[in-house]
């Protein structure tokens, strides 16, 4: 048996604006992961995949649907990249994940990264981050249509990064980040929120461009605060970025409630993370304030609360 895992992620700054050429900053969430197990099966020919979180078992050559196609393609592309004949393999794959689906934490990219790593390793090839990221980006295109490339990159490398149109700069943090993540319990439909912003942009490009420019300034100032280890400044910038996302119309009443609850409980700053419309928010905290903020988010209706320290 071969086992591999992958982290999830949150975007600190730059959602939506990144699609229009502005930068973004994202960090891995190492404590919330997906796993893949691959076993050689001697009694059967073909590749059988068990996706526990989907409640589905299917074969690689089964007729695809929108749920299983990304996983089928992840396996198929990995095997082809390593120059193995797909039809000659007899494998059983099991997938499980703690990453909530459709919440802006990169669940699809996380599962796909664990999957390509496990398949590659089982076929005697340790997948380097660049290879894994490239393979998972193909999966992201199936999942999201026009992905930014952030999810597959930050998850494959499991490092904080600055990103713009394929350009990546890995960040060295001045001090660890303590992040509390609250799940609103409502799915975030990235395609829908991206389409909403596109409609706004087409209707009033000057106003939306100005918002994107303001978000870009948050990104660059946030990057500087991260590298200098300045959590007070960083927290203020997170809250500013949230206000700009509200102006784009991609927040929700539930997300705003959680953001305010975190701030009242002592968070240095808080914002939605990911596509918005649902999904998750994050709060920056001093370590000693993490328990109080976590409890405040639960009391405000968060479905789940996660804590991660980013170094």
Write out the residue ranges for each language-model feature.
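Glycine-rich nucleotide-binding loop
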Residues: 90, 276-278
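Short aromatic/hydrophobic contact patches that present stacked aromatics
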Residues: 104, 280-282
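C-terminal nucleotide
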Residues: 1-13, 17-19, 26, 35-83, ...
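Glycine/charged-rich beta-loop-alpha catalytic/anionic-binding loops adjacent to active sites
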Residues: 89-101
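Gly/Ser-rich catalytic/binding loops embedded in alpha/beta enzyme cores
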Residues: 30
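DPxDG-like acidic metal-binding loop motif
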Residues: 103-128
């Amino acid at each position: 048996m071969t086992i591999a895992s992958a982290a999830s992620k949150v975007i600190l700054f730059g959602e939506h604006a990144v699609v229009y050429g502005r930068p973004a900053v994202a960090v891995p969430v190492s404590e919330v992961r997906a796993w893949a197990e691959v076993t050689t099966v001697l009694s059967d020919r073909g590749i059988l995949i068990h996706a526990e979180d989907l409640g589905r078992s299917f074969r690689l050559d089964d007729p695809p649907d929108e749920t299983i196609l990304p996983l089928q393609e992840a396996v198929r592309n990995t095997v082809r990249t390593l120059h193995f004949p797909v039809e000659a393999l007899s494998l059983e794959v099991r997938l499980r994940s703690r990453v909530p689906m459709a919440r802006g934490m990169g669940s699809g990219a996380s599962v796909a990264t664990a999957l390509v790593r496990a398949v590659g390793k089982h076929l005697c090839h340790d997948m380097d981050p660049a290879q894994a990221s490239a393979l998972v980006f193909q999966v992201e295109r199936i999942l999201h249509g026009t992905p930014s490339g952030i999810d597959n990159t930050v998850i494959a490398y499991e490092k904080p990064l600055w990103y713009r149109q394929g350009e990546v700069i890995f960040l060295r943090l001045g001090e660890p980040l303590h992040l509390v993540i609250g799940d609103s319990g409502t799915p975030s439909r990235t395609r829908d929120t991206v389409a909403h912003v596109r409609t706004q942009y087409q209707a009033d490009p000057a106003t939306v461009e100005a918002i994107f420019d303001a978000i870009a300034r948050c990104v660059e100032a946030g990057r500087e605060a991260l590298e200098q280890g300045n959590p007070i400044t960083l927290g203020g910038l997170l809250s500013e970025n949230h206000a700009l996302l509200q102006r784009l119309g991609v927040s929700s009443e539930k997300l705003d409630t959680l953001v305010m609850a975190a701030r009242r409980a002592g968070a240095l700053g808080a914002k939605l993370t990911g596509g918005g419309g649902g999904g998750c928010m994050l709060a920056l905290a001093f370590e000693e304030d993490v328990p109080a903020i976590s409890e405040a988010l639960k009391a405000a209706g968060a479905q789940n609360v996660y804590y991660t320290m980013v170094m």
